[in-house]
């Protein structure tokens, strides 16, 4: 599913690409879901995707506040205590992170074609290192990485801070926002990219409410389905 008019408008103008990470390049969102389901089960509550959608892409403390308030457990568990409890479980899961389908192919393709690429993620440095430790060679192809604990990121998504910081750090930056293509899976991330004035391709989890998807310029079900030439980028040279 895509917006043909938006894709046509962006054709030929993209010079730089920014990737989100969790749920887009790495299959880590399942870890958050698993741990949060365990925590809520103690309070006889269930973790649903409407709540997850509100948390995705945000800074940890912001997501934690949403979690305890929206689930109705804030009187029993503070956002800070939730993060401490969640952290102990996630530490063991993050090093097992797997790449999402199509991620390696797209990153390597853009790198070989000399398209500057980077990451803008809400993940803090300590978690970034754990999540990427099995894939360091691939992630080393990024020109730079902007993380959630970066001093220039005053506000998390949907604020544009992370994406604007990422655009500034490219060689000869800042890059014109209209020439940047962002890949995101989270509703808050899509809004952040649009708030930064950038083009955005959304690769949502199929369980996300479709109402969250009308802001993106293009929607695809997997990075495998992305056609670079639709955005004026060099086409893939293989048929996989």
From Swiss-Prot:
GO terms for cellular component: cytosol; mitochondrion. It is found in: Cytoplasm. InterPro entries: Gpp1/Gpp2-like, HAD-like_sf, HAD-SF_hydro_IA, HAD_sf, PGP-like_dom2. It comes from the Eukaryota. Keywords: Cytoplasm, Hydrolase, Magnesium, Metal-binding. It is an enzyme of class 3 (hydrolase). Its cofactor is Mg(2+). It catalyses: sn-glycerol 1-phosphate + H2O = glycerol + phosphate; sn-glycerol 3-phosphate + H2O = glycerol + phosphate. One of its GO terms (molecular function) is glycerol-1-phosphatase activity. Mg(2+) binds at residues 20, 22, 185. Its EC number is 3.1.3.21. Optimum pH is 7.0. GO terms for biological process: dephosphorylation; glycerol biosynthetic process. The active site is at residues 20, 22. Ubiquitous with highest expression in siliques. Mainly restricted to the meristem of immature flower and vascular elements of the root, shoot, leave, siliqua and developing embryo (at the protein level). PANTHER family: 2-DEOXYGLUCOSE-6-PHOSPHATE PHOSPHATASE 2 (PTHR18901), PSEUDOURIDINE-5'-PHOSPHATASE (PTHR18901:SF38). Belongs to the HAD-like hydrolase superfamily. DOG/GPP family. Acts as a glycerol-3-phosphatase with higher stereospecificity for L-glycerol-3-phosphate than DL-glycerol-3-phosphate. This is (DL)-glycerol-3-phosphatase 2. It comes from Arabidopsis thaliana. The gene is GPP2.
């Amino acid at each position: 599913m895509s917006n043909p008019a938006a894709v046509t408008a962006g054709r030929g103008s993209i010079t730089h690409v920014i990737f989100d990470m969790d749920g887009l390049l790495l299959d880590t969102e399942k870890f958050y879901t698993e741990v949060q389901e365990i925590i809520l089960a103690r309070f006889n509550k269930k973790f649903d995707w409407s709540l997850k959608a509100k948390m995705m892409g945000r800074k940890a403390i912001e997501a934690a506040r949403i979690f305890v308030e929206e689930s109705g457990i804030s009187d029993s568990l503070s956002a800070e205590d939730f993060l401490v409890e969640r952290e102990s479980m996630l530490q063991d899961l993050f090093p097992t992170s797997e790449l999402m389908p199509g991620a390696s192919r797209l990153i390597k393709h853009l790198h070989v074609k000399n398209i500057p690429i980077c990451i803008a993620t809400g993940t803090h440095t300590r978690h970034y290192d754990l999540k990427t430790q099995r894939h360091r060679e691939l992630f080393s192809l990024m020109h730079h990485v902007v993380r959630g604990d970066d001093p220039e990121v005053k506000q998390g998504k949907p604020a544009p801070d992370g994406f604007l910081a990422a655009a500034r750090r490219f060689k000869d930056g800042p890059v014109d926002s209209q020439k940047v293509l962002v890949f995101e899976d989270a509703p808050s991330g899509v809004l952040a990219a649009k708030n930064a004035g950038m083009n955005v391709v959304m690769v949502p989890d199929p369980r996300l409410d479709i109402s969250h998807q009308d802001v993106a310029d293009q929607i695809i079900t997997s990075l495998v389905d992305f056609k670079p030439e639709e955005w004026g980028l060099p086409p893939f040279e293989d048929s996989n």
